[in-house]
């Protein structure tokens, strides 16, 4: 995904 804090799939 985009630059999510801790959620980079």
UniProtKB/Swiss-Prot annotation:
The gene is evgL. It comes from Escherichia coli (strain K12). This is Protein EvgL. It comes from the Bacteria. Induction: Expressed in both exponential and stationary phase in rich medium; expression is higher in stationary phase (at protein level).
